[in-house]
Every structure is written in structure tokens, then in C-alpha cells.
């Protein structure tokens, strides 16, 4: 089975939704309320990272499936999909930033800026969902 089998894509989409619900459940309304090293910030960061990672994995698999080459980075997967017209340019650009956010979280490149975390958690989920919709709606039916 590939990530483009309907059952696998549906399962991964449901996993993304579960993570995004947990982000929404724990995300304080204001950035000032999101404090580092709290249960809320830990839950928001962990679940946003996990949802983003699933989408990244699907983007990488889509590049290979569509013969767009092997992305050199996670961000490159979204750039390739944008350049091929699979994902529209503005969405691809936002997903490139999501991949960068994922790297900061996963590799602790820098101290996490809670404003950036709050912004990503409040504004990023529609982009992750949008990408999943692209996979469902734009790829050929036999591949979706």
C-alpha cells in the first residue's frame, strides 16, 4: 500500500485531524497565555509537530509518486509540488514555512518563540487540511 491508497490517505488524514483537535483544545486564546514548559504548550507543540510531520511525509511520498524527484529537504517537497502545479503557490509557500517550524521543534535549533508557536497553532491547521484536500481532490482517482 502507498500513501495514496484511499484507506491509507483516510487514516493519515484522520490522524492529522486528531492532532489538530488536541492543538485546538489546548491552545490558549491569547499568545500571552501560552507559556513555555507548561502542559498546554507541550501539548500544542507536540500535536502540531505530529500533524505537520504526517503532512510532510505525504508530501515527500507525493513527490516520488508523481515522479517529481526526491526532495532534498522537507521544504523542497512542497516547493516541488508547487512548481508542478499540484499545490498552489501561496499554499506551497506556507507549507514550506510549516516544514521550517517542524525542524525548529524537532531539532531544537533555537529556543521556541511562543508567539511563533501560537501563530502556527492558530493559523497553520487550515494549510495542513488544505494540503490533505489537494491529495484527495487533485491526484488521479486511481492514485488517491
Feature annotation, model-predicted:
Residues 1-144:
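Solvent-exposed interaction patches of small proteins and small membrane subunits
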